[in-house]
């Protein structure tokens, strides 16, 4: 790849930006761009997808009936026609850049034009609670493998193989790192703040996690305790296990935070402990939606004996309530009949049961 990846997409819109106030970070913006060659089926397919805080908000697909950037979040619909027309034209320019560099990489790797190949580019930025850049990203991959990436210092490159070394030398001569760093520290951060402002009702909300601990028996006198955090937003969360107040790090299994499918996230952390020692372990949950961190233990279910005692007590209480209701009813009837036994008075024309039985004799 000789030419640097285009950055016009956001640079051309920089004049429209203004400082905004957002909820404490961190927040992120990412663009994932992909081109896939398909010999005999026309030009490579190009797709660009943008995410803010892991939520898709824009998409471009060259295979669409009318290829253009489309909003993928309701809050992006407030952008006017000029915005969409401009970034669509920029996307079509980037589509051409991908096609050219796919052909260039075929030469670098001495590959024929008859196969299917993929070029990917991920770029974006993270900001902290002060609104400033935490980290920037510029990463390229070819055929599913790392190719070249801008290092965290935003000054140097890491090339994955000999072909990528060619690109690294060309980009170093062209000052590409300075070019990308200026974008990441400037326009990327500013556009992220703008999008956070536009989508504040969705992106700046906080949903506190619902947490609990589950118990999973193992062999050899051990059990797994798993601490669950469900239904939280934003995605940033910390789960830790402690033994008698001391944090466990090496012995803890932690899964990546993953979307729940309803706009919230979920995560769990587990630890293997000796059977019978479960109460010595606590799970701590940290999330900005919580007024203070949660501390949880595994709560064993009631034993069979305890359950029977509870059932017996509830049965006695229920019986006492029924007896009390009957006594109250009888006392009330006695008061209503002047205390003469509380017998029911027969209505005019009615017959007692004894009379009816006599009348029915054969």
UniProtKB/Swiss-Prot annotation:
Residues 25-309 are extracellular. One of its GO terms (biological process) is immune response. Keywords: Disulfide bond, Glycoprotein, Immunity, Membrane, MHC I, Phosphoprotein, Signal, Transmembrane, Transmembrane helix. Residues 207-298 are annotated as: Alpha-3. It is a single-pass type I membrane protein. Residues 25-114 are annotated as: Alpha-1. Residues 115-206 are annotated as: Alpha-2. The modification Phosphoserine is found at residues 353, 356. It comes from the Eukaryota. Residues 332-362 are cytoplasmic. Heterodimer of an alpha chain and a beta chain (beta-2-microglobulin). Involved in the presentation of foreign antigens to the immune system. This is H-2 class I histocompatibility antigen, L-D alpha chain. It comes from Mus musculus (Mouse). The lineage of its organism: Eukaryota, Metazoa, Chordata, Craniata, Vertebrata.
């Amino acid at each position: 790849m000789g030419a640097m990846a285009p950055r016009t997409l956001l640079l051309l819109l920089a004049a429209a930006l203004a400082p905004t106030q957002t909820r404490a970070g961190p927040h992120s913006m990412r663009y994932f761009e992909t081109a896939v060659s398909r010999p005999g089926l026309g030009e490579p397919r190009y797709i660009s997808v943008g995410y803010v805080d892991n939520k898709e908000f824009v998409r471009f697909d060259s295979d669409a009936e009318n290829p253009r950037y489309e909003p993928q979040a309701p809050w992006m619909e407030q952008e006017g026609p000029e915005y969409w027309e401009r970034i669509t034209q920029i996307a079509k320019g980037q589509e051409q850049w991908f096609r050219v560099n796919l052909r260039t990489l075929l030469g670098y790797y001495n590959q024929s034009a008859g196969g299917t190949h993929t070029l990917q580019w991920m770029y974006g930025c993270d900001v902290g609670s002060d609104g400033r850049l935490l980290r920037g990203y510029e990463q390229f991959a070819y055929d599913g493998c790392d190719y070249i990436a801008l290092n965290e210092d935003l000054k140097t490159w890491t090339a994955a193989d000999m072909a990528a070394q060619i690109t690294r030398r060309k980009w170093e001569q062209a000052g590409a790192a300075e070019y990308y760093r200026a974008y990441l520290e400037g326009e990327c951060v500013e556009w992220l703040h703008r999008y956070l402002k536009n989508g504040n009702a969705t992106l700046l909300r906080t949903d506190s996690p619902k947490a609990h601990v589950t118990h999973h028996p193992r062999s050899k006198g051990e059990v797994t305790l798993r601490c669950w955090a469900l239904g939280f937003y934003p995605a940033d969360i910390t789960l830790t296990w402690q033994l008698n107040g001391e944090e466990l790090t090496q012995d803890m299994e932690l899964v990546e935070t993953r979307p729940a499918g309803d706009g919230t996230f979920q995560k769990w952390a587990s630890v293997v402990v000796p059977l019978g020692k479960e109460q010595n372990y606590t799970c701590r949950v940290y999330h900005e939606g919580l007024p203070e961190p949660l501390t949880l233990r595994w709560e064993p279910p009631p034993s069979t004996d305890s359950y029977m005692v509870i059932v017996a007590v509830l049965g006695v209480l229920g019986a006492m309530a029924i007896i009390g209701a009957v006594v109250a009813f009888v006392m009330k009837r006695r008061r209503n009949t002047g205390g003469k036994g509380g017998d029911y008075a027969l209505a005019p024309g009615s017959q007692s049961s004894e009379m009816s039985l006599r009348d029915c004799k054969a």
